[in-house]
A protein has these predicted regions:
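Hydrophobic alpha-helical
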Residues: 110, 122-138, 203, 220-277
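Hydrophobic alpha-helical segments within soluble ligand-binding/sensing domains
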Residues: 158-184, 228-229, 274-276, 292-309
Length: 331
């Protein structure tokens, strides 16, 4: 029995059969069931995923914990996760998302525990890099994917950008814009988010070749616009950096503080949120380094689904999304 023969029996195309047997694409549930029934009846031996699906027909409940409240960057991460879940709904996959605000370990732990209590089969989480979160994730009997930022736990994979590389790209841009001399203030969300700290490490590494450019401050804003405004307003009252590099969210609030200061400060950002694009259009942010948030959400759900049904892990346990520089007139 071949894919072509299954397609003929099901009255559909070979491409549709391939998508069903390989868990790709959004196929009508009735048609997907008909294809799987034919494959099972004819003892077709497809790839490992299809064998598992035919054998078990199990429902898959995936949980996700994301600090998206008040942080528009994560809107695209959530859209990606929901999009993939819809595509996999034909295979009995459901997705439950717990949205939290900020970087409080107790809040994150509570959200994860609630999902586990609801009986999720797998968990995707943007984890805080603190001992209590690591210990909890390590203790779970279900597969875990870390999304957007990573920590040292036994997980199926990390899905997100290479933050160190992102920081180095920012450092390259700083060198180009400051012409070899200047003072820089970096703004991160939290020292408990490894990705934010990796960006700062990458920035410092890139600037090692230009010793007259210094990173004089690393400010925390909890990825919150109000906190960002207050922190930068206080800092700028006593300091005048040549450049501010945002390495996380809270950019809208931080920009308000910079503009209110009246000081001539150049700005680099990360991500492509509405606020960042608006300030770029106005010429107030020179460039931003993006990281494909939609793909992060999409891949996190896909990786967990594949692992549950086939046991496959991504190579080296990493699924990296692309870091790209975007300027005002980028397409």
């Amino acid at each position: 029995m071949t894919i072509k023969q299954i397609a003929e029996k099901a009255g559909t195309s070979r491409g549709t059969v391939d998508r069903v047997l390989n868990g790709r694409g959004n196929v009508n549930p009735e048609l997907a069931k008909r294809i799987l029934d034919i494959a099972e009846r004819e003892r077709y031996q497809p790839n490992q995923l299809a064998q598992a699906l035919i054998r078990s027909r199990q429902r898959t409940h995936i949980g996700m914990v994301i600090p998206s409240v008040g942080n528009p960057f994560f809107d695209e991460v959530l859209r990606g996760a929901q999009s993939r879940a819809r595509k996999l709904s034909s295979y009995g996959t459901t997705l439950t998302i717990r949205e939290i605000k900020g970087y409080d370990a107790a809040t994150q732990l509570q959200a994860m525990r609630r999902l586990v209590a609801e009986g999720v089969d797998a968990l995707a989480v943007m984890p805080l890099d603190v001992p209590e979160v690591a210990a909890y994730l390590q203790s779970l009997p279900i597969p875990v994917v870390t999304v957007n930022t990573d920590i040292d736990v036994d997980r199926v994979a990390f899905v997100g950008c290479d933050y160190y590389n992102s920081g180095m790209i920012t450092g390259d841009l700083v060198q180009l814009m400051l012409n070899g001399r200047g003072r820089v203030a970096a703004v991160i969300g939290s020292t408990n988010v490894r990705g934010h700290m990796d960006r700062v490490r990458g920035l410092r590494t890139a600037l090692e070749s230009t010793p007259e450019i210094t990173v004089d401050a690393v400010l925390e804003n909890q990825d919150d616009d109000d906190v960002s405004y207050q922190v930068l307003r206080a800092y700028l009252a006593d300091h005048t950096p040549d450049m501010v590099c945002f390495a996380a969210a809270g950019i809208d609030g931080g920009m308000r503080a910079i503009l209110e200061s009246g000081k001539n400060i150049r700005v680099l950002a990360v991500d492509g949120t509405e606020a960042v694009l608006r300030y770029m259009e106005e010429g107030r942010i020179a460039a931003t380094v993006t990281q494909e948030p939609f793909a992060q959400g999409d891949e996190a759900v896909r990786v967990l689904f594949d692992y549950i049904h086939t046991g496959r892990r991504p190579a080296a346990g990493m699924v990296y999304t692309h870091n790209r520089v975007r300027v005002r007139h980028s397409q």
